Amino acid sequence: FLDFAFGSHGSFAVLGWVGTRIYQEKPPVPEKVVTQSGQLVYTKLDIQEGQNIWQAMGGMQIGSVWGHGSYVAPDWTADWLHKEILGTQNLLAKQFYQKTFDELTDSEKSSIKSKVTKIFKTNRYDVNTGVITIEDFRYEAIKLNVIHYSDVFLNGRDEYAIPKNTLIDPEKIRKFNAFIFWGSWAASTNRLDEDVTYTNNWPHEDLIDNKPTADTVVWTGVSIIILLLGIGLMALWYATQKGQVEHKDFPSDDP
């Protein structure tokens, strides 16, 4: 479950390769997500029903997940991740320095960034219990994201082609957020015993050093070459066939 069909955007070879990797080492859907203090954040059912809610809204016609979908609205994975990181940075800045992140010195910012990177990259999924455990302050950052997305789908966004009252049920909004959180978690969390995320460090996110792997870079180059070669071969075929195609005269009247 939670498999995504690849769209027609971007490089098909890269998407196919990344998709294969995700399928082979796909991120676990946890039984539940809890805080270190034991507070329940999301359940497996929340995540699964959240995907259904996203699909019922239009799915890949309304933004994308892991890069698969339309680009009118944001990629929800990348958007959620970026906002959650910013929220976590500010929460830690206030905890350690009693200032907002923007008010910190360069060395203080570097310290906070290092802490946040470790928080997001560290895999806290327990394979025995199926539970993901997150820090209490990270849950506070998640709550900030929930407020933002509630506003997006209740009040609409013209720039995203999302009309007002797209989602009005608070429970549906909560479950949609559960699904997007899970997608973001998979995109930022390293696989167990590996130094690469479940989505091969996609999306690119400098705030936690989520950068393309060497394999991704190589396949990007290969896919571009294949794409250009394919276009060239099609153009050559068309040029050689021109004048050889039999053109039939069409009747003047519709029979």
Where are these regions (language model features)?
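Juxtamembrane interface at the cytosolic side of transmembrane helices
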Residues: 229-255
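Post-cleavage N-terminal segment of exported redox proteins
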Residues: 1-42
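Hydrophobic alpha-helical transmembrane segments of multi-pass integral membrane proteins
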Residues: 2-5, 210-226, 250-255
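Selective detector of the "anchor" transmembrane alpha-helix that sits immediately C-terminal
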Residues: 10, 217-239
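Soluble extramembrane regions of membrane proteins in the secretory/endomembrane system
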Residues: 25-218
